[in-house]
């Protein structure tokens, strides 16, 4: 299954100073042949976070975009359009979302399910039950 990488996983992979850089690199090295994906949400989130002055080792917006562009220009990467809607109850069970912090993760998991892929994150608290049809294979926690 192709892996949709969470913003924090992208940060860890592309920032050598990130506390989880080695863990993310080890994971992607073992999984790269299956491919990885990004979407508008993860790309924009990466650029927004890494370019904030409060980020531990911030870079300019232009540098962040260039860094991500270089990472995606590989045969292993695929861009996924955000083709699912949080408003669709067949895609996301809103009764399972109990906090605003769960919204983006549930959406990204649903996007991975729609693409028959898996969502890769450091977040330990993602509820599979929020996305109808999601199984353990659709979620990888590093």
Curated annotation (Swiss-Prot):
Keywords: Hydrolase, Magnesium, Metal-binding, Nuclease, Secreted, Toxin-antitoxin system. It holds the Pfam family PIN. It comes from the Bacteria. GO terms for biological process: negative regulation of growth. Coiled coil: none annotated. GO terms for molecular function: magnesium ion binding; RNA nuclease activity. Mg(2+) binds at residues 6, 105. Its main location: secreted. InterPro entries: Mtu_PIN, PIN-like_dom_sf, PIN_dom, VapC_family. GO terms for cellular component: extracellular region. Its cofactor is Mg(2+). Its EC number is 3.1.-.-. Residues 4-126 form the PINc domain. It is found in: Secreted. Belongs to the PINc/VapC protein family. Toxic component of a type II toxin-antitoxin (TA) system. An RNase. Its cognate antitoxin is VapB44. This is Ribonuclease VapC44. The gene is vapC44.
């Amino acid at each position: 299954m192709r892996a949709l990488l969470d913003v924090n996983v992208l940060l860890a992979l592309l920032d050598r100073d990130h506390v989880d850089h080695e863990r993310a690199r080890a994971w992607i090295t073992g999984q790269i042949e299956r491919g990885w994906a990004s979407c508008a949400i993860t790309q924009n989130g990466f650029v927004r976070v890494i370019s904030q002055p409060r980020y531990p080792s911030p870079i300019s917006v232009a540098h962040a975009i260039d860094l991500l562009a270089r990472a995606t220009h590989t045969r292993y990467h695929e861009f996924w359009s955000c083709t699912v809607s949080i408003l669709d109850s067949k895609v996301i069970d809103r009764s399972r979302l109990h906090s605003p912090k769960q919204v983006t993760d549930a959406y990204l998991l649903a996007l991975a399910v729609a693409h028959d892929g898996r969502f890769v994150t450091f977040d330990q608290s993602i509820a599979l039950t929020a996305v109808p049809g999601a199984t353990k294979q659709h979620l990888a926690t590093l």
